[in-house]
Structures are given as C-alpha cells and as structure tokens.
C-alpha cells in the first residue's frame, strides 16, 4: 500500500482514537467497554486475516522501522499465520481482561499499552502516531475508571 491508500484508514483511526480519549476521560465505563470490544474484534479479524491472507501482514514491512523490517522479511514472513494468530490471541485476552476488575483489568491495561507501543514502529501501517495516543487513552482509562 502507498500513502494514498493509507490516508482514509489513517484518518478514521485518528478520529476513533480521539473519541476513545474523550470517552476514557468523560465516561470511563464506556471507554472500558469500547476498548474491550475493540481488542476482541481486532483479535478475531487478525486471526481470520492472518490465516486467509498472511501476505497482508508482510506488506506492513515496507513502512516499518529497519529493525522491524528485518524481522518481518525474515522469520515473520516464514511463519506469518502462526505469529499473527498468537498475537491475535493476545489481543482477545487483552479485550477479555478489560471487561474484568482489579488485577485482570490492570493486566488488560498493561497488555494493551505494551501491544500498542510494540506496533508503533510499523509506522503508518499501524496508523502511527495514533498508537501512542491509544496507549495514553488506556492509561487515562485506568486512572479514571478507578475513580468512577
């Protein structure tokens, strides 16, 4: 994909991200549900796409930082479906944990933050810098939800 093809998903992602920040601040219970659903649906989508069209994930290498490029075009390209499926299972667990309370909720928050920071080096393929803003929204969610 070239930059022109990324423009619409990039813009939509940033609008959603700003909405999530707002919800996590103003209505943390809604933010919690929204994030839980997002992670679960993203995990399901990634399992399906990772199995049916693994090349789509290898294509993200063109926009990634060099360290990620080497990994994507190396080991990852040989085991794309397996690696994407394992990551997607992690996304589903994060989503489930975000529906929980206390320790599991915190694990969901931490897992989500780590995941979002880990995909940031994919560049525009991860809609960077929205991934950093999303991680901030999860921190905000944790702080605000504990007070709600």
Protein language model regions, located:
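Extended, low-polarity transmembrane helix blocks
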Residues: 1-64, 70-148
């Amino acid at each position: 994909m070239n930059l022109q093809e990324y423009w619409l998903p990039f813009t939509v992602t940033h609008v959603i991200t700003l909405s999530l920040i707002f919800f996590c601040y103003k209505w943390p219970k809604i933010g919690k549900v929204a994030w839980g659903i997002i992670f679960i649906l993203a995990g399901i989508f990634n399992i399906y796409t990772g199995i049916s069209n693994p090349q789509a994930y290898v294509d993200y290498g063109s926009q990634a930082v060099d360290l990620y490029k080497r990994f994507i075009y190396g080991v990852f390209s040989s085991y794309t479906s397996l690696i994407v499926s394992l990551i997607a299972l992690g996304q589903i667990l994060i989503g489930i944990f975000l529906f929980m309370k206390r320790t599991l909720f915190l694990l969901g928050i931490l897992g989500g933050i780590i995941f979002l920071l880990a995909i940031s080096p994919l560049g525009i393929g991860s809609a960077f810098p929205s991934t950093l803003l999303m991680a901030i929204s999860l921190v905000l969610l944790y702080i605000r939800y504990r007070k709600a």
